């Protein structure tokens, strides 16, 4: 099963279609990518095909279950903890002890897997680098495959390079590098450039499978003293403990297939859906031999609330997104429950993102933003988190100082059980308690950020600087879903008295595109994908039926 894609737009690997069903037929339909043959080896492709054959039916069942669960929430208008798993929540159990490389996670940096980011993230001084194939990556075939090549090159010490402008990028000594934790795509996304038996593989199977196949043994051979001494993962968009169970079974299968000791893999689950927030114990329990912790998201969590309660009435209408902070009562309840759950079970609790991009041109903006970042990280450290995320290397020392002040020489604060007061379902769902208002300014910001992000995503960029913030797909999701929610609930905007309507959104969108055309100039504007982005933005914001993920209708536009 050779994988040189340069000879044909579609290569068939493996057995002919008439062969035994025991032999998978694999088709690589992606465009040529330099050095793809180093990643898409016959053995690696067969490994991914094995994951597909073993687990694709269950993935599809779980995706169907998401729709059933959403219908149940719509009918009930609420959520609660699962009665059938009360014994797990009440039980006395812990997850496996974290390996040495994951004991101290006080600062984690996130970003895509392009060559420049690989070097900068590993050198950043952060303890962990979340190498992102998910929300910070636009999943072009080039990005997906080159990202895998770049990670292998980093481990092999051949990632150094010099730009055309003469700037050199080189890794520090291995002991000074961040530990890599890879985030594959969520269960819902297909990879249309690799088919098994005529069916696209899950992006999750491809991202996880290629990385694990090529690097698991390599990392273990480096020894426990090395920061990169094991295969570690972040699991996104998990909606239930059954989805965590599937990941655990994938891990068990993968380790057995490659002769890697059981329990070598460690995974941190992002609690970025409202349904997962009600199943934190259960999620850790399903992954207990492979679990490393839980992470508290923000934009995707709010997006999930809108998605699930979009027709549940005024109580669930989110105000301007920038007014909803992690200190809002319902968000504070969610983070409190996450810290309590993690520390009770011996897992790390990792805080949210500081997305600010420092500017050398505007010291006043920098000073105000860095003060806000410091306050956020001080709060997280004081609330019991064991670490937190940043999006830019310049924020690493800011976050580290906040956690150093609380942790000192301790690697974490898992021995702190957190507040003893239980968190209730009512507290998690008290959206109205956030206060705030819905405004035209907030609506305009949602349009501005949404259209800018989608256009960049269509050009292959997944992490995009917008208004001094590093944004990824989660920001676009909350932006477009809030627009949908406000329109369908007849929200009246507090600052102007206008009603949120599709017509108003189209007016704001047209004005924004005109401003962008004037700002960029005709040539640069014409070279972009603004018209396609505008059509897609209208589709996912204004359609009668709510689109589960904007990336689903966007994916075919990537080519």
Question: Which residue ranges define each predicted feature?
Answer:
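Expand to "…catalyze enediolate/carbanion chemistry for C-C bond making/breaking, isomerization
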Residues: 2-559
């Amino acid at each position: 099963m050779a994988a040189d894609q340069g000879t044909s737009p579609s290569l068939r690997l493996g057995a002919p279609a008439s062969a035994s069903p025991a032999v998978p037929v694999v088709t690589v339909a992606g465009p040529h990518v330099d050095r793809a043959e180093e990643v898409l080896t016959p053995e690696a492709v067969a490994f991914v095909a094995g994951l597909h054959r073993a687990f694709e039916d269950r993935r599809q069942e779980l995706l169907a279950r998401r729709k059933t669960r959403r219908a149940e929430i719509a009918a009930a208008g609420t959520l609660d903890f699962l009665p059938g798993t009360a014994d797990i929540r009440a039980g006395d159990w812990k997850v496996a002890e974290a390996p040495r490389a994951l004991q101290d996670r006080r600062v984690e940096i996130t970003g895509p897997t392009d060559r420049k980011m690989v070097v900068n993230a590993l050198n950043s001084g952060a303890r962990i680098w979340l190498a992102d194939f998910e929300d910070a990556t636009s999943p072009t075939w080039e990005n997906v495959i080159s990202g895998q090549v770049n990670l292998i090159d980093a481990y092999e010490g051949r990632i150094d390079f010099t730009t055309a402008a003469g700037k050199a990028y080189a890794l520090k000594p291995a002991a000074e590098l961040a530990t890599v934790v890879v985030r594959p795509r969520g269960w819902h996304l297909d990879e249309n450039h690799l088919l098994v038996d005529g069916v696209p593989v899950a992006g999750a199977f491809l991202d996880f499978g290629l990385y694990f196949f090529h690097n698991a043994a390599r990392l273990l051979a480096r020894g426990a003293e090395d920061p990169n001494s094991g295969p570690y993962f972040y699991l996104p968009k998990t909606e239930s403990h059954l989805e965590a169970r599937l990941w655990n079974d994938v891990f068990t299968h993968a380790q057995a297939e490659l002769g890697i000791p059981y329990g070598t893999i460690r995974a941190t689950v992002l609690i970025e859906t409202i349904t997962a927030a009600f199943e934190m114990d259960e999620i850790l329990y399903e992954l207990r031999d492979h679990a490393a912790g839980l992470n508290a998201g923000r934009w995707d969590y709010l997006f999930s609330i809108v998605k699930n309660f979009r027709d549940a009435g005024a109580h669930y209408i989110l105000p301007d997104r920038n007014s909803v902070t992690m200190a809002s009562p319902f968000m504070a309840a969610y983070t409190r429950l996450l810290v309590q759950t993690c520390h009770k079970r011996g897992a790390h609790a990792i805080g949210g993102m500081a997305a600010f991009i420092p500017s050398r041109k505007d010291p006043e903006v920098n000073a105000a933003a860095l003060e806000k970042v410091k306050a956020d990280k001080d709060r997280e450290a004081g609330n019991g988190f064991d670490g937190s995320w940043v999006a830019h290397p310049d924020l690493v020392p800011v976050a580290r100082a906040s956690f150093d002040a609380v942790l000192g020489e301790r690697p974490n604060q898992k021995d702190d059980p957190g507040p003893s007061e239980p968190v209730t379902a009512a507290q998690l769902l008290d959206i109205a308690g956030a206060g705030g208002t819905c405004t035209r300014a907030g609506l305009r910001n949602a349009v501005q950020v949404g259209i800018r992000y989608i256009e960049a995503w269509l050009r292959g960029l997944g992490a995009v600087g917008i208004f001094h913030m590093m944004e990824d797909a989660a920001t676009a999701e909350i932006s477009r879903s809030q627009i949908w929610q406000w329109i369908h609930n007849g929200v009246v905007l507090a600052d102007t008295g206008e009603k949120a309507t599709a017509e108003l959104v189209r007016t704001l969108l047209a004005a924004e595109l005109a401003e962008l055309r004037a700002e960029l100039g005709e040539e640069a504007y014409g070279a972009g994908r603004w018209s396609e982005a505008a059509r897609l933005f209208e589709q996912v914001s204004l359609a009668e039926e709510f689109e589960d993920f904007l990336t689903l209708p966007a994916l075919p536009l990537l080519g």
